[in-house]
Amino acid sequence: MSEGLWIATAVAAVLVVIAALILGSVRYRRRRISLIFSSLSSGPSASDRSGSYTASSGITFSQTALPVQPADRIDTGELPAVGDDATVPRDSPRHTISDVLLPESELITSPDEPEAAVPHIDAIVPPEGRLDRLRGRLARTQNAFGRSILGLIVGGDLDEDSWQELEDTLLVADLGPVATESVMSALRSRLLNSNVHTESDARTMLRDVLISELQPDMDRSIRALPHADHPAVLLIVGVNGTGKTTTVGKLARVLVADGRRVVLGAADTFRAAAADQLQTWASRVGAELVRGVEGADPASVAFDAVDKGIGAGADVVVIDTAGRLHTKVGLMDELDKIKRVVTRRAAVDEVLLVLDATIGQNGLTQVRVFAEVVDITGAVLTKLDGTAKGGIVFRIQRELGVPVKLVGLGEGPDDLAPFEPAVFVDALLE
């Protein structure tokens, strides 16, 4: 074979080898990229801590649906690119490995830090036990309300004097004129279209009418479940002496006992005892507390509490506000400011108005004024065990247009229960 033919054959062989190497490299890179994308697509997704659930206390928690906000884009026009100013100046001294002095290794033992004491949290008392206590504590209401009405309608055929007496009974029980008229109208209609001969018949009819008046289909869940990027925010408002701070503590106890991380905001900066009381609750139930100095700006404390909740990855932030009379315009404006400032950091999910069930008619004026200043989403009716006028529940819902979500039944840590219209009416009529 001639020398030229050998050279041509060798060149051809080299070209074939090079082509094979290039082709193999391309296939390898494509397969590697494919595997990377496959692993990314099959990786675990971020865990979602939300989702409606009913706590062991019987209180139902839910999540507020918020509109999706587009993520803010960072303007990179003025930022240095990767690698800018990263080169070492040419005149910098050069060091070899032998020039670098390494420190002698020392075994440093850090002192053992004491573990933070985890507060012991007692199990939540089942709601059934609290509802049994409610029935017992409403004995005075039963005598003044349920028995009186049942005695009037057992016969089925009421004259005008009986209807007037029935109306007076409803008004005395604090149902108010609007709810009273609604109940009277429903009773007239039911009596015309049904036969009521026994107390059992009367009880069944009255029970249906009263439950319907309480609008059982209203959403009574507490919107205290976290969002994807920030905790739920609850604002607790009301006048002095209604039990706001105690309600905040009891609600925190329920949330922590069910595995939620809770931050409390002591925005009542006018009364030092309020922050101290909330500190006691926080220590007792295992919540975190954000408080300011006495006389600090309440809106600033509320903002810091929400900021702390976001930074700490909390599930819910509950803000206790100062008690204020509805007649104090300046304090009511301050309440509006608190909500506006907090909203800059995160949306407010719930504004719960705490009302004293024993105040009767005066509470309705409070309801109207607070509803004008902040959008009330629900009511918490405290001291329900101490009133003989259970009809206030009907009137509050009528005046406020939002549901009674929780009721306070006493001073105990578990004396906070979900409001259930059917259970409440049964307690009135037993």
From Swiss-Prot:
The keyword Heme does not apply. GO terms for biological process: SRP-dependent cotranslational protein targeting to membrane. Keywords: Cell membrane, Cytoplasm, GTP-binding, Hydrolase, Membrane, Nucleotide-binding, Receptor. GO terms for molecular function: ATP hydrolysis activity; GTP binding; GTPase activity; signal recognition particle binding. It is a peripheral membrane protein. It is found in: Cell membrane; Cytoplasm. SMART domains: AAA (SM00382), SRP54 (SM00962), SRP54_N (SM00963). Pfam families: SRP54, SRP54_N. Its EC number is 3.6.5.4. GO terms for cellular component: cytoplasm; plasma membrane. SUPFAM superfamilies: Domain of the SRP/SRP receptor G-proteins, P-loop containing nucleoside triphosphate hydrolases. Residues 75-95 are annotated as: Disordered. Gene3D superfamilies: P-loop containing nucleotide triphosphate hydrolases, Signal recognition particle SRP54, nucleotide-binding domain. GTP binds at residues 238-245, 320-324, 382-385. It catalyses: GTP + H2O = GDP + phosphate + H(+). InterPro entries: AAA+_ATPase, P-loop_NTPase, Signal_recog_particl_SRP54_hlx, SR_rcpt_FtsY, SRP/SRP_N, SRP54_GTPase_dom, SRP54_N_sf. Part of the signal recognition particle protein translocation system, which is composed of SRP and FtsY. Belongs to the GTP-binding SRP family. FtsY subfamily. Involved in targeting and insertion of nascent membrane proteins into the cytoplasmic membrane. Acts as a receptor for the complex formed by the signal recognition particle (SRP) and the ribosome-nascent chain (RNC). This is Signal recognition particle receptor FtsY. It comes from Mycobacterium leprae (strain TN). The gene is ftsY.
